[in-house]
């Protein structure tokens, strides 16, 4: 398939630049992946769509204030976006500047918040392809503390506005726990504490994986044929406890419901890894990077239902949804969502999808 097969027209006014004040009040498009049937709901209706004994898989990564502004020692302005924390003082980052800093170059970060000549000193240690390895000069302060002081929330480029104080809470799931993401697992933004308590009271089970979402999630696909695309790598943790819960859920005849594409990629990576090591009917713990790319023709080994936001045209995420619900069903649902003026992308509305069991498998 071609990347252009996943294009659709989206009016600019349908891009959500601010979230709903009430997380559960967003709209929910329910898509039956088996027959393409569509229902228009409110997100709080997921309480009626999820049954006792079903298992919800959440991604508990926490977004770090990963964007910093500063300058090089030579005076040139820079914008630094942390991609991955390596340890308490070193990180990999994207750096925007008129001229890329050279190895050994001194950087002064956070002067927009700390004042001129008061920036936090760092050094560009090495370059790794498009990423720069940066080390804080002062070892008495941890990177996370530095980011909390001078960092900005890394809102996606399509939101097209500076971050605001409210984004520190709004661009974070209520169950986020493990710092490391530079983008939110946005399907989870629609859950509030009250809805989670109601789901628990109904007998719905919860488990948490960790996938630290990287900035690569916003990168366009730059090839014509989707099979030629190489995914960026992101770090994943799927514990033995999660694996046990998934196996028990399947044995009980209940459903595994992934909250977000990052949860899908996490548990499907763990299942694929188990299959590659000779255990095709199992899922095993997974603590490693994943670059899994799921597109039409790829099979799902674990996930039965998916809760997800509306994604960018020609993105790997709409390709994943198309693999799950069927290409025609997905593109028709997106067409209806535009017609019905759903809100799109990170701060937008959501979908609840059950898997199309008849999608073609190429593997």
UniProtKB/Swiss-Prot annotation:
Subcellular location(s) per record: Cytoplasm
Pfam families named among the record's database cross-references: Queuosine_synth (PF02547)
Main location: cytoplasm
UniProt KW Transferase keyword: yes
Gene Ontology CC terms, in alphabetical order: cytoplasm
Lineage top rank: taxon: Bacteria
Gene3D superfamilies listed in its UniProt record: QueA-like
Record's keyword annotation contains Aminoacyl-tRNA synthetase: no
Broad class of enzyme this protein falls into: transferase
GO biological process terms held by the UniProt record: queuosine biosynthetic process; tRNA wobble guanine modification
Keyword annotations: Cytoplasm, Queuosine biosynthesis, S-adenosyl-L-methionine, Transferase
Enzyme Commission number(s) of this protein: 2.4.99.17
Function (record text): Transfers and isomerizes the ribose moiety from AdoMet to the 7-aminomethyl group of 7-deazaguanine (preQ1-tRNA) to give epoxyqueuosine (oQ-tRNA).
Family listed: Belongs to the QueA family.
HAMAP family: QueA
Protein's name according to its UniProt entry: S-adenosylmethionine:tRNA ribosyltransferase-isomerase
Organism: Haemophilus influenzae (strain PittEE)
Gene name of the encoded protein: queA
